Amino acid sequence: MAYNINMSPKRNPMPTQDAHERAHNFNEVALGYSEEAAINEAFRCLNCKNMPCVSGCPVKIHIPEFIAAVRGGDFEGAYKIITDTSSLPAVCGRVCPQETQCESKCVRGLKGESVGIGRLERFVADWHNTFGDGNVSAPKPNGHRVAIIGSGPSGLTCAGDLAKKGYAVTVYEALHTAGGVLVYGIPEFRLPKAIVAKEVETLRRLGVDIETNVVIGKTLTVDELFAMGYEAVFIGSGAGLPNFMGIPGEALCGVYSANEFLTRSNLMRAYLDDSDTPIMKGGRVAVVGGGNVAMDAARTALRLGADKVYIVYRRSMNELPARREEVEHAEEEGIEFRLLCNPVEILGFSNPENPRDPKNGFVRGIRCIKMELGEPDAKGRRRPVEIAGSEFDMEVDTVIMAIGTSPNPLIKSTTAGLEVNARGGIVVNEDGLTSRDAVYAGGDAVTGAATVISAMGAGKTAAKAIDEYLAGK
């Protein structure tokens, strides 16, 4: 059907909290589109016949189709189109890097800004959660049982896809709350816990059983899951083992991995005065790294009362791997970027005259060396090179290392015949099948730390393979 295309080169702006106000609270920064803004943005879509945007989506959402429904005001219909392929639309609409995926393929981006696909997805999911039909029922059981290890994006996606086909699915989560990295790793101001809980509840209504406080490799093993009657197992245990630089001073009090810092804040409320697992608040904080996790840690530290927060990154602003939107939000909130420098030592306080001085063993600063960009590395980014003799010190009280994570070796060490690569990632084929029969894996447990949507894509791929495998038994 013909319609009048909105040819504005600019997308509809996303309303946000004022930067000065939001720097002191954990409320969501982006406020979401109104119905009017969503429909107006939907009219920017050209409804391309070859649908290049879909090719950029790891879970292959029918993007032009759901946008057409938004354009016509059928928001519930749009939700049904999205959830035909995605189990976590309200999550993806908020945290997926659409600018490097579906939106990067949008034809409107050739002469202006791409259609705000992620913003429209979020609008549709939020509208459904507020006004839509929440009646979801489990399909007829098909008699097969599947165990999912981990309730992060790959595990939840795999569970949802299998549950829709009638499988009896049990998800085993090591922590006390379902959601994986979505709840322990991403702060409330970017992804509210209530949003994740709503998505998880939808899966429960589909018949998915979620058991928390079960550590596979400790509480149960993969082999014991098969002994319990499960016919296939999907490992979506993520990459929760933090990386460090191996420089002097990393054992000082006041040095955290971003993984620990965010988990304590997001999930354990360690910022409370009576917390059993407190984290340091206030003072000057240096966050080492340039990805989304670094931005999350820096902005969390600011909200916890830090006097000053620095991002320390060895490349320039152009090479920052974090989403541009997150970088802009951090800058607006007053976080200072110390670029083209890299830590070589974390400096600690030591009072030789008073070994009982309570400051002994705590961070007092960080020593960095200036960098310059050399030749491109294997990923095409210019390699940072140290400038000899350029060391300088920064006075800080807390250092947060946000330089990536690796898969935990626990499952590998308790599962005979499970092959992993040099970085600890589980080795899989194109269907997510591991070196063990009927054991599949996906997400960060395979790739190391990556995006939510790529993990979801891996969960979807594995679910399809598991269905084909069990259908043939």
Describe every region a protein language model picked out.
Residues V171, L175-E211, A298-E345:
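Rossmann-like dinucleotide-binding cores of NAD(P)H-dependent redox enzymes
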Residues N47-G72, V91-V124, T170, T177, ...:
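Iron-sulfur cluster-binding cysteine motifs and their immediate structural context
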Residues H144-T170, A294-L302:
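N-terminal Rossmann-like FAD-binding beta1-loop-alpha1 element of flavoenzymes
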Residues G77, K140, R145-I149, A197-I247, ...:
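Feature captures the FAD/FMN-dependent oxidoreductase FAD-binding
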Residues R22-N40, I61-R94, K111-K140, S265-N266:
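Ferredoxin-type iron-sulfur electron-transfer modules in oxidoreductases and energy-metabolism complexes
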Residues A297, A445-K473:
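A conserved FAD-binding loop/helix module that cradles the flavin
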Residues V124-K140, K198-K218, P242-L304, V420-S435:
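Glycine-rich dinucleotide-binding loop and its adjacent helix/turn
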Residues A251-G282, P376-A449:
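FAD-site-proximal beta/loop scaffold in flavoenzymes
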